[in-house]
Design a protein with these regions (language model features):
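Short amphipathic alpha-helical interaction/hinge segments
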Residues: 27, 31, 80, 96, ...
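Hydrophobic, membrane-facing alpha-helical anchors
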Residues: 23-32, 131-136, 158
Length: 268
């Protein structure tokens, strides 16, 4: 079976095992029929206990219910990371950093917030609209209200932008940081736990998954969509998303120094 993609491999393996289970019963059925046993007797012998499954919030076991919402935001976080670092990096690339800081009266926090706020509003509108399409138009079932999903999406957008600011502060050269955030976005998609359970990964990889905002977002959303068990089960993830903002704030002085030094403007 194909395990290059775990989700596809799991489906193929499940279908293969179901087929083999049916084929393995064929000789027994033929022999029992030859002995004169009726269909009900054969069924009772082969399946003495019938299982009855009732999946919560997805009785049809529709894969789109499980994957549509997280997959959208997994890919969306890559766009947020790339747009955010380019928006800030363009000031260094086109050597307008001094004018940018002067417009903010040399306040790096004001400069970053003023630069990113329009993008934040656009990303938040896109997130709310995506939730409306998935849960209002496509009628994907969910256990919570509509606004908790939107507030979680908005927090995710801001936390992802904060991660982008943090990474750009570490690598304040747009030619370098574009590659870095692309790698971070890809790793976040891999380690978010959508296609493979994080708990089953190697311990170092498991703990590394919590370095990505999308992992915390997926855990919060799973809580909201499949039970809405309350804030006590997600407060760690919510706190972690706020922690990304603190990381970005901590490196703003370094970013300001990098802009004023002009030494990253010639890196292509």
């Amino acid at each position: 079976y194909h395990y290059a993609l775990l989700s596809v491999g799991g489906e193929v393996r499940g279908a293969f095992e179901t087929l083999l289970r049916t084929l393995s019963l064929a000789p027994v059925v033929v022999q029992a029929t030859a002995m004169g046993l009726g269909e009900n007797q054969i069924t009772t012998f082969l399946l003495p206990v019938r299982s009855s499954s009732h999946p919560l919030f997805n009785p049809d076991l529709d894969y789109s219910v499980y994957l549509s919402n997280p997959f959208f935001f997994v890919f969306f976080q890559v766009i947020i990371l790339l747009v955010t670092v380019y928006a800030i990096g363009s000031e260094i690339k086109f050597r307008t950093g001094d004018e940018w800081l002067e417009a903010a009266r040399m306040n790096m926090f004001v400069a970053v917030v003023g630069k990113l706020l329009p993008y934040t509003i656009i990303f938040c509108i896109m997130s709310v609209f995506a939730n409306y399409i998935m849960f209002g138009v496509m009628h994907i079932p969910f256990a919570c209200g509509f606004w908790p999903l939107n507030l979680t999406a908005i927090l995710f957008v801001v936390a992802t932008q904060a991660l982008a600011v943090f990474l750009f502060s570490l690598f304040p050269a747009i030619a370098i940081v574009i590659s870095v955030v692309s790698m971070v976005g890809s790793l976040g998609a891999t380690l978010c736990g959508v296609t493979f359970p994080v708990d089953s990964m190697y311990a170092p990889v498991h703990f590394a998954s919590y370095l990505f905002p999308v992992r915390h977002f997926v855990e919060i959303n799973q809580n909201l969509l499949y039970g809405d068990y309350g804030f006590p089960y997600t407060w760690v993830n919510v706190s972690s998303l706020f922690a990304f903002m603190l990381l970005a704030l901590a490196l703003l002085p370094h970013l300001k120094t990098a802009i004023l030094s002009h030494k990253y403007e010639n890196i292509r």
